[in-house]
Amino acid sequence: MKRAEGKYVSWSGFARPALFDLKYPLSCDLWCWEALVGKAKAKAKKKTTGARAKRDRRRKLATEAPASAEELLASVPGLDALQDVPAFDDLPVDDAQRAAFDDFCARAEEPEQMQLGAVVRLDRGFPLVATADDTFRAEHAVGFAKSRGEDEVLLPAVGDRVAVRRAPGHDMGVIECVLPRRTSFERWRGRARGERQVLCSNVDSVLIVQALGAGEVLLDRVARSLVLALDCDAEPVVVLTKADRCDADELERDLDRVHRLVGPDVRVIVTSSAEGRGLDEVRACVPAGSCAMILGESGAGKSTLLNALLGHDTLATGGVRERDDQGRHTTVARVMVALPGEAGVIADAPGLRSLPLVGHERGLARAFPEIVEASRACRFGDCTHTHEPGCAVREAEDAGQIDSLRLETFQNLASSMRVSAQMLDPDVHL
């Protein structure tokens, strides 16, 4: 124990002094100090053990020989093991895509081998492509190789219309061109300076799935999903699952907050796969010839909802941990499934734990149009709508023209976007 100035003592000498320098009044009993020190040491030991385990795993992976393309292909499911795979006719091709395909074929060698296709599934980097004549696995052409430094956003994604070459007598094809995307649902992920990842392309609507019955609905996640959907020109639909887990009062409270957050123009559907509630409403949001993407974190009930819409268990489902209601990843591939009857196609992707917003100003403006419109009358062009004089947005809030929950959410998202942009480029000042 070392006495510091005044009536405080400082504990140091641990593995990371800056993290464990604790200051408390001298009146604390000795047993309290011992408990605090023991807890700090245990936390440090746990961190060290976890870091060592991660380092050992990285070393093991570095020494193992990478799997060959043949080994990876052998590990993906065969077509005979898949159900509800969309046909080529389920995914319409627009005029711009067809014109781009014709132009590419006119310049390609052996154009008779080229086919117009749609990527309906992605397993371990191997797309499953549906064409007018067949459905088969394909690989990327050399021009798509990531080792050359291309952005991942250029790689074929689920929902892409592609020009694929398939030589006579070959089981696999080669994707040589990704045709223009009508819409593209992208997110930023990983790496120090970020990387764009296309989760699905050519989508018409996004089903924002959020579970009920686990405390308050995660409004921040719903808001981020709303911004991402509107940014890519897709129609957002909020789907609240597991309604059977909450009582009437909880449901009314959560519904009120969600409606306040998303505004009157966004549809909100309450569902329960166990009771069959709301399934027809969700199905009506995906008419024949359209494509919807289902978006939600692990444990939100995406796969369970899809199985209920399909009428049988096609996708694997998993439980959630009771202590924090967090789910485990059960969807490990990006897949499309065709709904039965007069309905369209739904794309499913692994649950996303984070939804960073970078460069989604257009989506933010579309999600909160009344705030953007009111901000045009603010005295200062860079008004943050928090403390500046002459803020027209706060005046509109006081007058009841802007919901306080929507304004608070808008401010949080705008601040998050500024921080994310500066992380990608420290020279950016917003």
List PLM regions with ranges.
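Structural detector for short beta-strands of small beta-barrel domains
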Residues: E112-D123
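Helix-rich effector regions associated with P-loop NTPase G domains
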Residues: D21, C28-F88, E110-Q113, E150-R161, ...
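Beta-strand/loop nucleic-acid-binding surfaces
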Residues: T135-E152
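Canonical P-loop GTPase G-domain recognition
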Residues: C246-S298
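A conserved segment at the C-terminal end of the G1
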Residues: T304-T314
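Conserved glycine(s) of the Walker
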Residues: G301
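Conserved Switch II/interswitch segment of TRAFAC-class P-loop GTPases
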Residues: L179-R182, V203-D220, D244-A248
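Conserved beta-strand/loop subsegment of P-loop NTPase cores
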Residues: V203-Q210, D233-T241, D265-V270
